[in-house]
Amino acid sequence: YIHENIVYSVPTICQHAGALGIANRKTICPPLYEEYKERMYLAYERLKKLKHVEVLKPQGTFYIFPKISVPGMTTKEVLKEILEKTHVNLIDGEAFGPAGKGFIRIAVTVNKDKINEAFDRIENLEIFKK
């Protein structure tokens, strides 16, 4: 495996693209920050409307980490139901350590239409209406 790390590297074109991005970060990054901020607040506002969900106002990044506490269900059971009935895949917070138990992680890396579509499906689940 050492041989692979010495002989192989990131393709040259990717290295050039990365260098270009770093060199132009003052132009590229602000619109991206604004877009992710809008997506994050969209997800936050949609999560606040769901029963059995507690969410703190986001302060950065493109992840949001709400607490899910549906009576009579574990987080894994809730996530399984969401996936099976809505085809929306969310990550169990416990995957990031024991402190994540009862939480889920949502990445807002898709466009706002997709975020709204996912929440439209989730809001229709009975577990979030009871």
Please state what every model-predicted region is.
Residues 1-130:
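PLP-dependent class I/II
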